[in-house]
Amino acid sequence: MRESILIFGGKNLKEMEEDGGIGWWYVNQERAENLEYAVITRCLTQEWATHDVEQGTAIMICKLTGMVDKAIDSNRKCLRFSSYAKINIPNAWQKMTNSQRNPFKYIETNK
Protein backbone atom coordinates (compact mmCIF):
# COMPACT_ATOMS: atom_id res chain seq x y z
CA MET A 1 0.00 0.00 0.00
CA ARG A 2 1.40 3.37 -1.03
CA GLU A 3 0.56 6.37 1.12
CA SER A 4 0.14 10.07 0.58
CA ILE A 5 -0.78 12.84 2.99
CA LEU A 6 -3.63 15.33 3.06
CA ILE A 7 -2.56 18.60 4.72
CA PHE A 8 -4.79 21.36 6.11
CA GLY A 9 -2.56 24.44 5.88
CA GLY A 10 -2.59 28.19 5.45
CA LYS A 11 0.64 28.79 3.49
CA ASN A 12 0.82 29.62 -0.19
CA LEU A 13 3.32 28.22 -2.72
CA LYS A 14 5.86 31.04 -2.22
CA GLU A 15 5.88 30.49 1.55
CA MET A 16 6.33 26.73 1.10
CA GLU A 17 9.24 27.31 -1.27
CA GLU A 18 10.83 29.69 1.27
CA ASP A 19 10.44 26.98 3.95
CA GLY A 20 12.11 24.45 1.65
CA GLY A 21 8.96 22.35 1.43
CA ILE A 22 5.65 21.67 3.11
CA GLY A 23 6.24 22.27 6.79
CA TRP A 24 6.39 22.15 9.70
CA TRP A 25 4.46 19.08 10.94
CA TYR A 26 4.71 16.50 13.74
CA VAL A 27 4.82 13.51 11.40
CA ASN A 28 6.49 10.13 11.78
CA GLN A 29 9.93 10.40 10.09
CA GLU A 30 9.99 6.91 8.57
CA ARG A 31 6.42 7.13 7.35
CA ALA A 32 7.01 10.63 5.92
CA GLU A 33 10.05 9.47 3.92
CA ASN A 34 7.85 6.96 2.08
CA LEU A 35 4.95 9.24 1.16
CA GLU A 36 4.23 9.70 -2.56
CA TYR A 37 2.13 12.87 -2.69
CA ALA A 38 0.82 15.69 -0.53
CA VAL A 39 -2.57 17.22 -1.22
CA ILE A 40 -2.70 20.72 0.26
CA THR A 41 -6.07 21.99 1.44
CA ARG A 42 -6.69 25.53 2.62
CA CYS A 43 -7.05 26.30 6.32
CA LEU A 44 -8.18 29.84 7.09
CA THR A 45 -8.17 29.70 10.89
CA GLN A 46 -4.79 31.41 11.34
CA GLU A 47 -4.48 35.19 11.05
CA TRP A 48 -1.52 34.81 8.65
CA ALA A 49 -3.27 32.29 6.34
CA THR A 50 -3.57 33.02 2.64
CA HIS A 51 -7.22 33.86 1.93
CA ASP A 52 -7.44 32.79 -1.71
CA VAL A 53 -10.17 30.13 -1.62
CA GLU A 54 -12.83 28.78 0.75
CA GLN A 55 -11.87 26.82 3.88
CA GLY A 56 -11.12 23.17 3.06
CA THR A 57 -10.55 23.63 -0.67
CA ALA A 58 -7.79 21.42 -2.13
CA ILE A 59 -5.42 23.86 -3.84
CA MET A 60 -2.36 21.85 -4.82
CA ILE A 61 -0.99 18.34 -5.22
CA CYS A 62 2.75 17.91 -4.73
CA LYS A 63 5.04 15.02 -5.73
CA LEU A 64 7.14 14.35 -2.63
CA THR A 65 10.86 13.54 -2.87
CA GLY A 66 11.21 11.37 0.23
CA MET A 67 13.53 13.99 1.72
CA VAL A 68 12.32 15.17 5.11
CA ASP A 69 14.00 18.00 6.99
CA LYS A 70 13.82 18.16 10.78
CA ALA A 71 13.53 21.47 12.60
CA ILE A 72 16.53 22.28 14.79
CA ASP A 73 14.45 23.22 17.82
CA SER A 74 11.61 20.66 17.68
CA ASN A 75 10.44 17.36 16.20
CA ARG A 76 8.51 19.09 13.43
CA LYS A 77 9.26 17.98 9.88
CA CYS A 78 9.25 19.69 6.49
CA LEU A 79 8.30 17.55 3.48
CA ARG A 80 10.23 18.39 0.31
CA PHE A 81 8.51 18.26 -3.06
CA SER A 82 9.88 18.12 -6.61
CA SER A 83 6.84 19.24 -8.59
CA TYR A 84 3.28 20.38 -8.08
CA ALA A 85 0.02 21.05 -9.85
CA LYS A 86 -2.52 23.64 -8.77
CA ILE A 87 -6.04 22.29 -8.30
CA ASN A 88 -9.34 23.65 -7.02
CA ILE A 89 -11.56 21.10 -5.30
CA PRO A 90 -14.01 22.72 -2.85
CA ASN A 91 -14.71 21.00 0.49
CA ALA A 92 -11.98 18.37 -0.06
CA TRP A 93 -10.81 18.52 3.57
CA GLN A 94 -14.33 18.15 4.93
CA LYS A 95 -15.16 15.25 2.58
CA MET A 96 -11.94 13.29 3.10
CA THR A 97 -11.56 13.75 6.86
CA ASN A 98 -15.03 14.44 8.26
CA SER A 99 -13.59 17.86 9.26
CA GLN A 100 -11.16 16.28 11.75
CA ARG A 101 -9.12 18.58 13.99
CA ASN A 102 -5.68 17.05 13.31
CA PRO A 103 -4.14 19.16 10.49
CA PHE A 104 -3.03 16.20 8.38
CA LYS A 105 -4.25 12.75 7.44
CA TYR A 106 -2.42 9.84 5.86
CA ILE A 107 -4.38 8.46 2.91
CA GLU A 108 -3.94 5.54 0.51
CA THR A 109 -2.57 6.97 -2.74
CA ASN A 110 -4.86 4.88 -4.95
CA LYS A 111 -8.12 6.01 -3.25
Labelled PLM ranges:
Residues 1-111:
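Structured alpha/beta reader/binder surfaces that contact nucleic acids or chromatin modification marks
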